Amino acid sequence: MSSSQDKANLPANNSRARAKKLVLELQDEICAGLETIDGEGKFLEESWERPEGGGGRSRVLKDGQIFEQGGVNFSEVHGNELPPSIISQRPEAKGHSWFATGTSMVLHPKSPYIPTVHLNYRYFEAGPVWWFGGGADLTPFYPYLSDTRHFHSCHKNACDTIDKDLHKVFKPWCDEYFFLKHRNETRGVGGIFYDYQDGSGLLYKGQNANGKASKIAKELGEYSLNWENLFSLAKACGQAFLPSYEPIIKKRKNQSFSTKERDFQLYRRGRYAEFNLVWDRGTIFGLQTNGRTESILMSLPPLARWEYGYKPEENSREALLTDLFTKPQDWFTDKSLEKRCLTHQALD
């Protein structure tokens, strides 16, 4: 992609204000919906300011009926010195003042049968450079195929409102991004992920030139999406979250669980912490730009555990997670998944 963009691909005149308004509204809508779903827990809000410019508001819910801990953050930060993580990706932004705004969410439910879930939608500008990024992904501990398919279906439908090719790239990109290289497994069952979307070039702008997402993007060819298309994409995907997650909670919240299942949940939460601290670019960006540490690390689970050399019992429900649900799958069309899940009571 060239470092200059034609006039047709410039952001809207009021791009920063509109992007900020969008992510603020998403934060409000999601928090209100989650409080209703939980029934007991309430979000406590803390506003913060960044000395170099900007600030945000962090909302955290603790010890609810459903959620052990959950956070939904908003930030709007700006400055003159770009962090190395941005310059390495887009060197043409160097020397320009920059602006970034976004909302991010991580929910850690009490029940091992309700998946952890993450969401993030963001916008960035620096001189001639601008882009949207975002996505949502699901991390179950005792997964069900129907829950996984529902989550993916809702986000595919949101992408399809803009262009039916988007999900073809954003789904495998999510599998690629939320991957623990040191464990050789995905963080969960994925969802969608996209970054550096400025409406030009190939849809895939990640780092794995030989991966599935890159291959599909090359087959589709260069895309011409404008600022409004990508703004609408962020809105549609953000609004798809509650319908994608609430039905899963309703189906699983009354399932009883044992100490064994709770211990396995905490063990797998350790993997979640490993990814966020080692691989997540959002965490790295926040720490490099002197963001609010408490907000940046809000994504970490309140409790987690590690166990040396743990191996699940063969053919167990726990083994199914690592054998099937922490590997990229074609959730919609692979009929063999149903047979494998049925024998482990993971199909309903």
Curated annotation (Swiss-Prot):
<dbReference type="InterPro" id="IPR001260">
    <property type="entry name" value="Coprogen_oxidase_aer"/>
</dbReference>
<comment type="subunit">
    <text>Homodimer.</text>
</comment>
<keyword id="KW-0560">Oxidoreductase</keyword>
<keyword id="KW-0479">Metal-binding</keyword>
<dbReference type="GO" id="GO:0006782">
    <property type="term" value="P:protoporphyrinogen IX biosynthetic process"/>
</dbReference>
<feature type="binding site">
    <location>
        <position position="152"/>
    </location>
    <ligand>
        <name>a divalent metal cation</name>
    </ligand>
</feature>
<keyword id="KW-0149">Chlorophyll biosynthesis</keyword>
<feature type="site" description="Important for dimerization">
    <location>
        <position position="182"/>
    </location>
</feature>
<feature type="binding site">
    <location>
        <position position="118"/>
    </location>
    <ligand>
        <name>a divalent metal cation</name>
    </ligand>
</feature>
<dbReference type="Pfam" id="PF01218">
    <property type="entry name" value="Coprogen_oxidas"/>
</dbReference>
<dbReference type="GO" id="GO:0042803">
    <property type="term" value="F:protein homodimerization activity"/>
</dbReference>
<dbReference type="InterPro" id="IPR036406">
    <property type="entry name" value="Coprogen_oxidase_aer_sf"/>
</dbReference>
<feature type="binding site">
    <location>
        <begin position="120"/>
        <end position="122"/>
    </location>
    <ligand>
        <name>substrate</name>
    </ligand>
</feature>
<comment type="function">
    <text>Involved in the heme and chlorophyll biosynthesis. Catalyzes the aerobic oxidative decarboxylation of propionate groups of rings A and B of coproporphyrinogen-III to yield the vinyl groups in protoporphyrinogen-IX.</text>
</comment>
<dbReference type="GO" id="GO:0046872">
    <property type="term" value="F:metal ion binding"/>
</dbReference>
<comment type="pathway">
    <text>Porphyrin-containing compound metabolism; protoporphyrin-IX biosynthesis; protoporphyrinogen-IX from coproporphyrinogen-III (O2 route): step 1/1.</text>
</comment>
<dbReference type="InterPro" id="IPR018375">
    <property type="entry name" value="Coprogen_oxidase_CS"/>
</dbReference>
<dbReference type="GO" id="GO:0015995">
    <property type="term" value="P:chlorophyll biosynthetic process"/>
</dbReference>
<feature type="active site" description="Proton donor">
    <location>
        <position position="118"/>
    </location>
</feature>
<keyword id="KW-0627">Porphyrin biosynthesis</keyword>
<keyword id="KW-0963">Cytoplasm</keyword>
<feature type="binding site">
    <location>
        <position position="182"/>
    </location>
    <ligand>
        <name>a divalent metal cation</name>
    </ligand>
</feature>
<keyword id="KW-0350">Heme biosynthesis</keyword>
<protein>
    <recommendedName>
        <fullName>Oxygen-dependent coproporphyrinogen-III oxidase</fullName>
        <ecNumber>1.3.3.3</ecNumber>
    </recommendedName>
</protein>
<dbReference type="GO" id="GO:0005737">
    <property type="term" value="C:cytoplasm"/>
</dbReference>
<comment type="similarity">
    <text>Belongs to the aerobic coproporphyrinogen-III oxidase family.</text>
</comment>
<feature type="binding site">
    <location>
        <position position="108"/>
    </location>
    <ligand>
        <name>a divalent metal cation</name>
    </ligand>
</feature>
<feature type="region of interest" description="Important for dimerization">
    <location>
        <begin position="272"/>
        <end position="307"/>
    </location>
</feature>
<dbReference type="GO" id="GO:0004109">
    <property type="term" value="F:coproporphyrinogen oxidase activity"/>
</dbReference>
<feature type="binding site">
    <location>
        <position position="104"/>
    </location>
    <ligand>
        <name>substrate</name>
    </ligand>
</feature>
